[in-house]
C-alpha cells in the first residue's frame, strides 16, 4: 500500500497540533511498531524550469506511423512554446505540466530544445510517471481546471517536496490499509492524542428521513451490514479537484470521475471500500444473494465472468449490479451522463471475498481490504463522508434517505468479545517490568475499552480489531508499542553433542549422492496441479486421489496437498524443456500428505491453557500421514553427445540405477521386481523392495501419460518412501583382502520375463562368500537363443580373504552359481 507522508502527517496533527517528524524518523517508527516499509519514495527530484502551461493549439502531423501533435502551449504572460508530443489524452484548453529546456527530470533526464518530426520542440509535456508521481505511462498528466494558472511553478503545484511510503500490510492488520489506521498507530507510537477521522466530530451524521431503499439479503451470505444513500443531481461534467486527484495518484489510483474518485478517496482515508451505482440504471429493488449455477456477469472492465454458486452478488430486478466486495458490474456503472448516484457501503465475508477474487483473478483494492476485514461500525460514517465530498465537488443534493441493514436481528454492537487478562501478563512474557498502568494505557490507545477488576483486566477490542481474540494478542500489542528492543535477548541453553538425527544424516547423504550423480535438486510445490491424476489415468479408488484440501489456498485451482512428489517434478521438467534445457535430471526430497479413511478434522481447542491428554490424542489422530519421499525424473540424454558419439538417451535402467544410488546412500539392499503401476510403463516399471517391504517404484513413464502431460519421449521417474526404509547403523569399514582376484564370465539363458535382478540374486546365492562382485554387462536376444528367451552375461569377481584363489576354486564357485540359477529361475548355461 502507498500513502503520502503529507496526508499521514495532516491526520495525526489534528489531535497533536504542531506535531512534525521527518520522513526518515517516520520510517523508523513504523518499523519499530511492526510495519514493514518496503520503500520510501521521494517525489521528483526536479531541477530547472518546470511550469504549468495551457494548451492553446494542437496541429495533427500526418505521414507518421503513430499520432504526432505539434502543440502551442501558453506558459504565462502569453508566451507560447511549440512542443511535439505523441500523447492524445489532452485537448485545447487543458492545463499540463511542461519541462522547459534546461530542466532535469527524475532519473537524470535532461530536457533540451531539439528538432523532431521536422519541427522544433521547445520542451516536453510530462506524464505522471516522468515526474515520479506514479507509474501511469498511459498519457499526459492533465491538471483539473483551476488547479493553477499558466506560468505557475510546476514543482509547487504538484507538491514534489512530498514523500510516498510503500508499506507491506500483514493480513492481520487490515485496519492499517488506510490513513485512519496508520495515523492511529503513529499516535500510539508517539503517545499523542488521536482524533478519529471517522468520529462524529470529523464526520457529523447527515439527517435521516424518508423511506429506505428496498433491499433483501439472502441468509448465510456472510453480509454483516449494507448501507445505501443517494446523491441526486450531480454535474456529469464535474472534475475532481487537484488535491484529491494528487492523493489518489500518489496512492497508485487513477482519477476518473468524481463519483468514483470520492469512493476511492474515502476508502484510502477511512479504510472502508464503497461502490457508486448509477441510480437511474437500477431496476426495482436491490438484493444480496449467492450466484446461481451457470450465471455470468459483465464487470466494470468489460469482461464477462463465469460465476460460482459460492460467489455473493448484488442484484436488481434485471441484472447483476456487483460481485460483492470484488468489483462492480457494467449494468449499473456510473457513466459520463450519470446525474443520480446511489452510494453503497457493505461489510462482506472476508473468506468469501478472498475465494471469489482469487478464482476470478480480480485482485481489487476493495477486495484486498475486505479479505483482511473492514470496520463495520463506520459504514454509515464512510457513506456520509463520501456523499458530502461528492456533493461538494460535483454539486447535487445528498438525499436524507438512508438504508442501513445491520443483520437479522439488527446488530448494534460491533466490538469483538471481551478478553480477560492478568495485568502483569505482558511483563511476565516479555521479562520486562513495565511502569504501572502501561498495559491499560497501551490497550486504550489502540481503541480498546479497558476495565479493572483487581489484578485482572477486561479488555473489549475495538470494532476494527477482530484479530484480537485472546490474551496473547493483547500482549503482542503492548510489547510492540513499548518497543521490542527493550525485551532482553536471552538465548535458551542448547544441549551439546546431539548433532544430526539419523534421518537428517540420511537425507543429506542421499541428496549429495544424487547431486554427485548429475541430478539437480528442486524445492517442489506442496500443492497438486488440477486434474493431474486424470492425466495419469488413475482409478477412482487409487489412494493417491485421497487428498487433503486447503480451505484458503495460495492458488484457487490448487487447493489439494500433494500425495506424491512426481507432479511437481514433472512440471519443473516441462518448464526446463520449454526453455531449451532438454537433457534434464531433477530430484526432490520432501514430505507428502497422505490422509486415510480414519483422518478426521477437529474443532478449535482453547489456547489459554494446556491441552488435555485426550485433546492431544484427538489432534494426533486427526493428522494425515506425512512421510518423507525422495523422487527423481530424467529426460533427454543421460550420456552427452560429443566426439565420442551421439550420446545415450535416458532409459528405464537409469531410473533403476537412481534407486541403487539411494539404496547405497541409505546403506540398505533393495530388490527390483516387475510391476504395473501408473504413471509408469507396464513393461518398464519396477517395484522397489527393502526386504519384503515395498518402498516405491521406478522406471519409464507410460507413453500415454507422457503424451498427455507434454513430456519428452522416454521420460523416466522414480519415487521412494524414505520413511518406509529403515535407518541403518553406520557400516564398519570393509576389510580389504591383500590377495589377487579371479575374474570369470558366465552367460545364462532364461525366459524373457525373468528380471535380471532375480538371476543375479540366484548367482550370488550359489557362488557363496568367494563372490566379491557381480555385474551384468550384456543382454542378447535372437533366433540362436530361442523365442521368448534372452541371454544374460555377468562378469564375476572372486576373491578370498585369507589365501590366493586358484582357477579351480573360482570355477567351482562359478559352477555352484550356475546350478543355483538353474534351480531358482530355470537358467541354462549358454554354450
From Swiss-Prot:
It comes from Mycobacterium bovis (strain ATCC BAA-935 / AF2122/97). GO terms for biological process: phenylalanyl-tRNA aminoacylation. Keywords: Aminoacyl-tRNA synthetase, ATP-binding, Cytoplasm, Ligase, Magnesium, Metal-binding, Nucleotide-binding, Protein biosynthesis, RNA-binding, tRNA-binding. Its cofactor is Mg(2+). This is Phenylalanine--tRNA ligase beta subunit. The gene is pheT. CDD domains: PheRS_beta_core (cd00769), tRNA_bind_bactPheRS (cd02796). Mg(2+) binds at residues 467, 473, 476-477. Residues 737-830 form the FDX-ACB domain. Tetramer of two alpha and two beta subunits. GO terms for cellular component: phenylalanine-tRNA ligase complex. Gene3D superfamilies: 3.30.56.10, Bira Bifunctional Protein, Domain 2, Ferrodoxin-fold anticodon-binding domain, Nucleic acid-binding proteins, Phenylalanyl-trna Synthetase, Chain B, domain 3. It is found in: Cytoplasm. InterPro entries: aa-tRNA-synth_II/BPL/LPL, B3/B4_tRNA-bd, DNA-bd_dom_put_sf, Fdx_antiC-bd, Fdx_antiC-bd_sf, NA-bd_OB-fold, Phe-tRNA-ligase_IIc_bsu, Phe-tRNA-ligase_IIc_bsu_bact. Residues 44-155 form the tRNA-binding domain. It holds the Pfam family tRNA_synthFbeta.
Amino acid at each position: 500500500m502507498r500513502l503520502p507522508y503529507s496526508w499521514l502527517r495532516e491526520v495525526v496533527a489534528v489531535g497533536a497540533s504542531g506535531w512534525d517528524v521527518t520522513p526518515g524518523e517516520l520510517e523508523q517508527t513504523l518499523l519499530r511498531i511492526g510495519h514493514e516499509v518496503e520503500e520510501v519514495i521521494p517525489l521528483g527530484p526536479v531541477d530547472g524550469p518546470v511550469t504549468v502551461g495551457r494548451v492553446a493549439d494542437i496541429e495533427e502531423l500526418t505521414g507518421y506511423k503513430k499520432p504526432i501533435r505539434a502543440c502551442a502551449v501558453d506558459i504565462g504572460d502569453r508566451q507560447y512554446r511549440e512542443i511535439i508530443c505523441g500523447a492524445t489524452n489532452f485537448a485545447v484548453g487543458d492545463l499540463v505540466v511542461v519541462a522547459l529546456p534546461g530542466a532535469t527530470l527524475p532519473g537524470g533526464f535532461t530536457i533540451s530544445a531539439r528538432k523532431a518530426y521536422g519541427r522544433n520542440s521547445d520542451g516536453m509535456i510530462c506524464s505522471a510517471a516522468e515526474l515520479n508521481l506514479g507509474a501511469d505511462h498511459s498519457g499526459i498528466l492533465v491538471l483539473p481546471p483551476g488547479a493553477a494558472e499558466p506560468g505557475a511553478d510546476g514543482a509547487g503545484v504538484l507538491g514534489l517536496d512530498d514523500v510516498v511510503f510503500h508499506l507491506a500490510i500483514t493480513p492481520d492488520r487490515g485496519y492499517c490499509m488506510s490513513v485512519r489506521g496508520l495515523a492511529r498507530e503513529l499516535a500510539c507510537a508517539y503517545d499523542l492524542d488521536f482524533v478519529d477521522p471517522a468520529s462524529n466530530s470529523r464526520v457529523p451524521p447527515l439527517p435521516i428521513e424518508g423511506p429506505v431503499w428496498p433491499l433483501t439479503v439472502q441468509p448465510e451470505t456472510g453480509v454483516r451490514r449494507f448501507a445505501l444513500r443517494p446523491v441526486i443531481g450531480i454535474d456529469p461534467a464535474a472534475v475532481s479537484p487537484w488535491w484529491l486527484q494528487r492523493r489518489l495518484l500518489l496512492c497508485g489510483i487513477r482519477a476518473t470521475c468524481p463519483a468514483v474518485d470520492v469512493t476511492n478517496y474515502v476508502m484510502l482515508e477511512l479504510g472502508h471500500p464503497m461502490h457508486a451505482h448509477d441510480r437511474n440504471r437500477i431496476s426495482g429493488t436491490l438484493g444480496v444473494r449467492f450466484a446461481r449455477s451457470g450465471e455470468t456477469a459483465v464487470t466494470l472492465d468489460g469482461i464477462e465472468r463465469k460465476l460460482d454458486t459460492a460467489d455473493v452478488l448484488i442484484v436488481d430486478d434485471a441484472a447483476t449490479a456487483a460481485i460483492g466486495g470484488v468489483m462492480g458490474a457494467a449494468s449499473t456503472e456510473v457513466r459520463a451522463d450519470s446525474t443520480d448516484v446511489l452510494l453503497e457501503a457493505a461489510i462482506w465475508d472476508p473468506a468469501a471475498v478472498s475465494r471469489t477474487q482469487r478464482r476470478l483473478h480480480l485482485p481489487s483494492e476493495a477486495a484486498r481490504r475486505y479479505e483482511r476485514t473492514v470496520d463495520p461500525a463506520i459504514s454509515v460514517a464512510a457513506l456520509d463522508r463520501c456523499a458530502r465530498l461528492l456533493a461538494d465537488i460535483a454539486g447535487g443534493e445528498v438525499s436524507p434517505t438512508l438504508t442501513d441493514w445491520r443483520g437479522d436481528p439488527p446488530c448494534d454492537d460491533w466490538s469483538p468479545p471481551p478478553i480477560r487478562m492478568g495485568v502483569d501478563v505482558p511483563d511476565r512474557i516479555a521479562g520486562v517490568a513495565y511502569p504501572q498502568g502501561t498495559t491499560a494505557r497501551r490497550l486504550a490507545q489502540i481503541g480498546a475499552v479497558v476495565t479493572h477488576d483487581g489484578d485482572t483486566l477486561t479488555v473489549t477490542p475495538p470494532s476494527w480489531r477482530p484479530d484480537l481474540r485472546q490474551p496473547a494478542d493483547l500482549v503482542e500489542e503492548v510489547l510492540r508499542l513499548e518497543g521490542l528492543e527493550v525485551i532482553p535477548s536471552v538465548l535458551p541453553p542448547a544441549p551439546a553433542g546431539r548433532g544430526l538425527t539419523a534421518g537428517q544424516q540420511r537425507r543429506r547423504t542421499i541428496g549429495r549422492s544424487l547431486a554427485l550423480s548429475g541430478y539437480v535438486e528442486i524445492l517442489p510445490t506442496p500443492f497438486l496441479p488440477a486434474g493431474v491424476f486424470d492425466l495419469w489415468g488413475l482409478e477412482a479408488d487409487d489412494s493417491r486421489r485421497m487428498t487433503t484440501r486447503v480451505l484458503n489456498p495460495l492458488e484457487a485451482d490448487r487447493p489439494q496437498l500433494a500425495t506424491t512428489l512426481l507432479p511437481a517434478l514433472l512440471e519443473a521438467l516441462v518448464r526446463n524443456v520449454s526453455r531449451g534445457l532438454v537433457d534434464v535430471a531433477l530430484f526432490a526430497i520432501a514430505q507428502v500428505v497422505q490422509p486415510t479413511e480414519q483422518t478426521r478434522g477437529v474443532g478449535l481447542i482453547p489456547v489459554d491453557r494446556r491441552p488435555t491428554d485426550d485433546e492431544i490424542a484427538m489432534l494426533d489422530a486427526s493428522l494425515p500421514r506425512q512421510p518423507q519421499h525422495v523422487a527423481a525424473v530424467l529426460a533427454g540424454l543421460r550420456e552427452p553427445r560429443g566426439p565420442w558419439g551421439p550420446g545415450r538417451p535416458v532409459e528405464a535402467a537409469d531410473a533403476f540405477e537412481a534407486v541403487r544410488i539411494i539404496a547405497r546412500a541409505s546403506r540398505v539392499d533393495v530388490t527390483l521386481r516387475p510391476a504395473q503401476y501408473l504413471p509408469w510403463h507396464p513393461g518398464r516399471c519396477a517395484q522397489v523392495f527393502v526386504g519384503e517391504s515395498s518402498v516405491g517404484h521406478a522406471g519409464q513413464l507410460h507413453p500415454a501419460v507422457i503424451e498427455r502431460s507434454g513430456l519428452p519421449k522416454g521420460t523416466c521417474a522414480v519415487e521412494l518412501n524414505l520413511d518406509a526404509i529403515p535407518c541403518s547403523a553406520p557400516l564398519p569399514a570393509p576389510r580389504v583382502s591383500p590377495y589377487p582376484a579371479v575374474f570369470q564370465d558366465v552367460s545364462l539363458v532364461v525366459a524373457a520375463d525373468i528380471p535380471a535382478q532375480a538371476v543375479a540374486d540366484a548367482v550370488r546365492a550359489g557362488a557363496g562368500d568367494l563372490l566379491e562382485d557381480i555385474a551384468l554387462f550384456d543382454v542378447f536376444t535372437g533366433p540362436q537363443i530361442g523365442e521368448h528367451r534372452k541371454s544374460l552375461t555377468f562378469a564375476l569377481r572372486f576373491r578370498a580373504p585369507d589365501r590366493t584363489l586358484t582357477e579351480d576354486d573360482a570355477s567351482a564357485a562359478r559352477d555352484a552359481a550356475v546350478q543355483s540359477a538353474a534351480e531358482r529361475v530355470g537358467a541354462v548355461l549358454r554354450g
